[in-house]
Amino acid sequence: AWYRGRGYWLAPPALRMKEGKVRIEVPASDEWGESQCLGILPSIEAAYHMPARLQSELAERYVRMLNKRLEELVLVEGHRFGALVLEPLVMGAGGMIFVDPLFQRCLVDVVRSREDLFSLSDPPLRDACVNRDADGWRGLPVVYDEVFTGLHRLGFAMGADVLGTPPDINCLAKILTGGVVPMSVTLASDSIFRAFSISDQKTHALLHGHSYTAHPVGCQVTLETLDMLDEMPTKASWDPAWLERMSYAKRLRGIMSLGTVLKLELESSTGGYASDAADDLLRT
């Protein structure tokens, strides 16, 4: 085959409100074994209160599991990783999965603390994992893909506002122009940016570009969008009382909301994009 995947995808715990409570559920997987409920939280607000949740027993369980799984992947299975890439809080491309933010915070913390694992990589990543400035990235570069969720879609500017820890690289797109013209941005910390400027060799530069790089119309629309965001209310959300009532609906497996995003999960024997559950509901 012309392509061989080198990444590894963890099965994340997902949040689902049912009968007024937020359940933390995991699918059957190598990480968790059988599908199960890891815990129940009293409200959506409690699920995203990171300072309190970091002190919980579940945080300790996440850290133990992540350390164990990473050790298996690197030391036993021989994986070599170059970065941690995640969609903060809501995996839009994965089926609107509301990932437990505590799990993502623990994942970032563990990856940044395990230089002993990632310094085993082949050159040049081996040298890049150590001997950096005090404010540089650690373990692996952490990339937040906020193409869908960034810039107030979820009720706050960035995922780091909830997770409580910033990325080393951040990707933004959709809200920059609302899809009117092509535009995206990739933001990087100083330590990441300097990696492309310490050499005089052209091959060490970030030789990347496409037809719409620095597109002037897109750049101007983006500037106008950012000005509008500064003037608009910074937080919008669905009515909590309505969400709680809907969580008791018999046809719903669960409901979740964050900022402007609402997810209604229908009871269905089939899932994914091929499911006809929504059509069946509209016909009734």
Task: Describe each model-derived feature in a short phrase.
Residues 1-284:
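Conserved N-terminal phosphate-binding loop of PLP-dependent enzymes in the Aspartate aminotransferase
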